[in-house]
């Protein structure tokens, strides 16, 4: 078992979860290699590749992370708004925040890392090999790059869930409702819109009209059990794992790759810096993912043209 051991307690499994440092006592390990040629030999032989991606991938497309210094929207940190309690207390304010994030994403494009992953997935698929993307990001940039086999473990900015009937539905409207048009500016001096709840996004199912919420994982919420089951299955069968642009300090995704490594599967980390999990991996490639990942995933000389 991989994922089920990592089922986190209530309050620690959000896509905006505060950084939780891994507290294992790592045994003495060999320093990870940065030998791209050696990695490429593993890549050429792999039949089932799992690629775990985090905020670092999207950051290279200019997507705000709302983490660390300056990670504010108006005067609030993301964790102030990304909770069921905040939505219950002030759905207008929370929807302004998510409307802003949705609109920002319309100007962002997949970067070379997204495109390299999508091209690799398509190419290896034609060879009877598989690539699966397990992403902590909620921006759908992997989909826009052309990736097909994507698990969005923290949900999507472009899906909604009805608070009444529970329907989950893709929603790419801009604005998502008329009352939010022009709202959501991030400037701290911006006046709150205070939109009446009946004018916020509503369910379109006949006879429902329930209040919609963003279909993302908030503080105090657990991840979707069906998605975790599928992720567990993918991680158990993979014979090569890449960890791309993730800090490895947020649960449960922080433990995915280390547990894959614990069964002897090569794991390669692509990140701007070392992480608490780096010493557990066979490879570490430091630098922008958009620069380090494409040459790692390009066609190998052993592949048929």
Curated annotation (Swiss-Prot):
Function: NAD-dependent lysine demalonylase, desuccinylase and deglutarylase that specifically removes malonyl, succinyl and glutaryl groups on target proteins. Has weak NAD-dependent protein deacetylase activity; however this activity may not be physiologically relevant in vivo.
Protein name per its UniProtKB record: NAD-dependent protein deacylase sirtuin-5, mitochondrial
UniProt domain comment: In contrast to class I sirtuins, class III sirtuins have only weak deacetylase activity. Difference in substrate specificity is probably due to a larger hydrophobic pocket with 2 residues (Tyr-98 and Arg-101) that bind to malonylated and succinylated substrates and define the specificity.
Keywords: Cytoplasm, Metal-binding, Mitochondrion, NAD, Nucleus, Transferase, Transit peptide, Zinc
SUPFAM superfamilies in the cross-refs: DHS-like NAD/FAD-binding domain
Name of the encoding gene: sirt5
Main location: mitochondrion
Cofactor names: Zn(2+)
HAMAP family hit by this protein: Sirtuin_ClassIII (MF_01121)
The keyword NAD appears for this protein: yes
Cystine bridges: none
EC number: 2.3.1.-
Sequence ranges assigned to domain Deacetylase sirtuin-type in this UniProt record: 33-303
Residues annotated as binding NAD(+): 54-73, 136-139, 245-247, 271-273, 289
GO biological process, one term: peptidyl-lysine desuccinylation
């Amino acid at each position: 078992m991989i994922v089920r051991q990592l089922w986190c307690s209530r309050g620690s499994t959000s896509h905006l979860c505060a950084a939780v440092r891994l507290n294992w006592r790592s045994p003495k390990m060999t320093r990870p290699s940065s030998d791209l040629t050696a990695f490429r030999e593993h890549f050429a032989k792999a039949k089932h590749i799992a690629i775990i991606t985090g905020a670092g991938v999207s950051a290279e497309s200019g997507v705000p992370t709302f983490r660390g210094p300056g990670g504010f929207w108006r005067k609030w940190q993301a964790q102030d708004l990304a909770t069921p309690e905040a939505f219950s207390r002030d759905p207008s304010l929370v929807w302004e925040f998510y409307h802003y994030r949705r609109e920002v994403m319309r100007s962002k494009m997949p970067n070379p890392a997204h495109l390299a992953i999508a091209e690799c997935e398509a190419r290896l698929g034609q060879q009877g090999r598989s690539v699966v993307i397990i992403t902590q990001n909620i921006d759908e940039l992997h989909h826009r790059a052309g990736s097909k086999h994507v698990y969005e473990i923290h949900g999507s900015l472009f899906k909604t869930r009805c608070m009444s009937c529970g329907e989950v539905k893709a929603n790419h409207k801009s604005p998502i409702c008329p009352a939010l048009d022009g709202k959501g500016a991030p400037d701290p001096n911006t006046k709150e819109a205070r939109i009446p709840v009946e004018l916020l996004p509503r369910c379109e199912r006949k006879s429902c009209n329930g209040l919609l919420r963003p279909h993302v994982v908030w503080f105090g919420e657990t991840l979707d059990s069906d998605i975790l089951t599928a992720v567990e299955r993918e991680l158990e069968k993979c014979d090569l794992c890449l960890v791309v642009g993730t800090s490895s300090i947020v649960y449960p995704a922080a433990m995915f790759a280390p547990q894959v490594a614990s069964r002897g599967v090569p794991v390669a980390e692509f990140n701007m810096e070392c992480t608490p999990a780096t010493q557990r991996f066979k490879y570490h490639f430091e630098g922008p993912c958009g620069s380090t990942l494409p040459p790692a995933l390009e066609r190998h000389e052993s592949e048929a043209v």
